[in-house]
A protein has these predicted regions:
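Bacterial Sec-dependent N-terminal signal peptides
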Residues: 1-26
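Low-complexity, acidic/polar, glycine-enriched regions of mature
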Residues: 20-180
Length: 180
C-alpha cells in the first residue's frame, strides 16, 4: 500500500512538473488583415472609424490564451462615418494634441497581464493600456476561435488626459471610446 501511494505521488509530481514546462506558443497577428474599430461619443452623437495595428501577438499555453501584446499605429486614425473636408478635419483633430498627440505619441500599446477562462473560447482579460504615455489597467472580454480573435473595450478617454471640449474634468465623466 505504501508503495502504491508513493508511486502515485511520484506520478503526480512528474505530471505537475511536466505541465510547468508546456511551451508557450506565440501567434503573430496578421496586421494587414486586422484593425481596431472605434466609436467615440460626444454630446451631440458619435463618430466611428479604424486604427491600424503596427504589431500584435497572442500567447497560448496548451491551446489556452495566457497573454499578448498589441501596438497600435495612432497616426493611422481614420474616421469612416464622414467624408471629404469634415473627415479630414476630424482625422486631423484626433491626431492633434487636443486628443491623441500622435506627433509625440505615435503608438498606443495593450499588454495583456492576466487571463481567466470564462467559457469555451472565451476569456476575461486584464491588460495595461498605454495612451499618450499614461498606462492604466483595463478589463475586457476576448474570444478566440482558431486563428480569429475579437475583443471589446470601453475606455474613458479622460483618464488618459484627453479632455478636449469639456468645461471641467467632471463634464468628461462617462465619456468613452468603444474599441473592437
Amino acid at each position: 500500500m505504501k508503495k502504491r501511494i508513493l508511486n502515485s505521488v511520484v506520478v503526480l509530481a512528474v505530471a505537475m512538473g511536466a505541465s510547468a514546462f508546456v511551451d508557450v506558443v506565440t501567434k503573430e497577428v496578421n496586421v494587414k488583415q486586422s484593425q481596431v474599430h472605434w466609436k467615440g461619443y460626444k454630446v451631440t452623437g458619435s463618430h466611428y472609424g479604424t486604427i491600424d495595428l503596427k504589431s500584435g501577438s497572442l500567447e497560448f499555453q496548451a491551446d489556452v490564451l495566457t497573454g499578448g501584446e498589441f501596438i497600435v499605429d495612432m497616426n493611422s486614425i481614420n474616421t469612416t462615418d464622414l467624408s471629404g473636408e469634415y473627415k479630414d478635419q476630424l482625422d486631423g483633430h484626433l491626431k492633434s494634441d487636443d486628443f491623441f498627440g500622435v506627433e509625440k505619441y505615435p503608438t498606443a500599446t495593450l499588454k495583456i497581464t492576466k487571463v481567466t477562462a470564462s467559457g469555451k473560447n472565451s476569456y476575461d482579460a486584464t491588460a495595461d493600456l498605454t495612451i499618450k504615455g499614461k498606462t492604466l489597467p483595463v478589463d475586457f472580454e476576448i474570444s478566440v476561435y482558431g486563428s480569429k480573435a475579437t475583443a471589446n473595450l470601453k475606455i474613458d478617454r479622460s483618464k488618459y488626459n484627453i479632455r478636449y471640449g469639456s468645461g471641467s474634468f467632471f463634464d468628461n465623466l462617462g465619456r468613452r471610446v468603444d474599441v473592437s
